[in-house]
Amino acid sequence: MGIRSLLPHLWIFGLLGFGVYTWRAVEGWGGSDLDGSTLTPSGPAHVLGLAHAIHLRPTLNYGQEILNFSNLVGKRPAVVMYFMDWQGNPNASGLERYFDPYLLNTISNTLPVSARPAVMLTWQPLHGRQATGCAQDYPGAIPLPDILNGKCDLYIRGFAQALKARPERFLLRFAHEMNISDSPWWVGHIGADPSLYVAVWRHVHRIFKQVGVSNVEWVWNPNYASNPPDPWNDLHAYYPGDDVVDWIGLSGYNWYATRSPAIWRMFTDLYDAVLKDLACSYPKPQIIAEIGSVEGDGATFSKAAWIRDAYSRAPSYPFLRVVQWFNDYAYADPRSADFRVTTSTAQDGSVQPLPPSSGAWTSAYRDAIGNSVYTTTLPALSAATPPARFCGGDPFALAPAFLLLPPTGEAVVSITGIGFTVPLTLAPMLPSGISGTLQGGVWNPPWAASSLRIQTTNTPLGFYTGSVRIQGPGLSRTLPISIQVVSRVYPIWIPMVRR
């Protein structure tokens, strides 16, 4: 894991004459998150849930394929994902040269607006066009240095303009699984420097920003485990930065006997450690962008049981907002691992049925997503983004818990809650002479943030204690606040340098 400087907010108190000098780092307070992330008060009563999402292989009538799948499993997806390379449609004109809208048009022609999913584009820097100099270096991907040096800027800009012109909400999953040697854009093929990947990501993102694209959200998606597991290849080394990432995605499968060694890996074996690690590292909503399991021996190891277990455990991870099943063969190859839960359609339109013994797969999936926690709407990014990082432990935090105030003055306290499961209400309990204004007094799972503005008005000097009471079904917590009212408060800023 890359070294991340977590700078505590340093207060040093010294009594000089009749006042109190306070020494503070310039970074400011960030609730339970020490990196200065903005805390947003909770909005209207709304339980986020987890968005039901699916990868379906593109077909001639993709909209009908989505509709058929929805009917089979009893719930429409909030997100649909498919793969695309960097070739576009060289025979088209205008923006269609950079982005072929055929699949999206079949969706809009088949599904009513209310039933159309958000679209995750897994955007792979493959193929390109020799004539433009932005081309694949076979058998690898388009070389990352070529992208960074601007050889693909014309295509990237045209692609960005094409997406901007569409009405859909896009999740752009660019150059995914960059931390495994199977990936054509893994930097280990040309060296061992993940900063190259980071620079390429930021370069591509910068072009989208210049174009002014507002309907694209960026999904950074490593594999759940780095391969090789060398320190330089740690997935955190590939993180491009909070300012250019909207969602964190993950990929991980139970391959069992289709890959060596033949280990039956449950959901927690794949995802538990990495979901918690990422929640502790980045205040970003999480997506399981590729998940699937093959069949086991049918007795000790069962695919149907695996599905039920995975979907029952996913809601316990507070940052996880989307679970997206990979409803296809691995690599779209019928000779490879079969992760499907329903029949699928080949590109020629032929139906690829499930094996005769697999009737339980669809039933298990239908039952699993039938849980009301799995929704048919992807929450807005602002609602899906957690208020702070969370490293486990106490889900409730109040900061700063100690205030220095003059007799007439004010300060703002941030209150965060992460990982709770029942609706909560907040109430400030402050002593006489000190008032408080609470923004966001109703919290809904899985997280929320509020701010409490504390004011003194001709308050006598002295030491005061108060609290914020958090209550809900089966839960009652009190977060203490200490307030020292002094004649004067002198702020002295100490610049802190990250190393």
Predicted regions and their residues:
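Sec-dependent, cleavable N-terminal signal peptides
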Residues: 1-33
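Substrate-binding cleft of secreted/luminal carbohydrate-active enzymes
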Residues: 34-62, 84, 285-382, 386
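Structural recognition of the beta-strand scaffold that forms the well-ordered cores
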Residues: 49, 77-84, 118-123, 171-174, ...
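Alpha-helical scaffolding within the catalytic cores
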Residues: 60-69, 94-108, 154-159, 224-240, ...
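Substrate-binding cleft of extracellular glycoside hydrolase catalytic domains
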Residues: 86-220
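Glycoside hydrolase catalytic-domain groove-lining segments
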Residues: 95-122, 243-297
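Aromatic-lined carbohydrate-recognition surfaces of secreted/lumenal glycan-active proteins
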Residues: 205-233, 283-296, 322-328
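Long beta-sheet-rich domains in secretory-pathway and surface-associated proteins
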Residues: 383-490
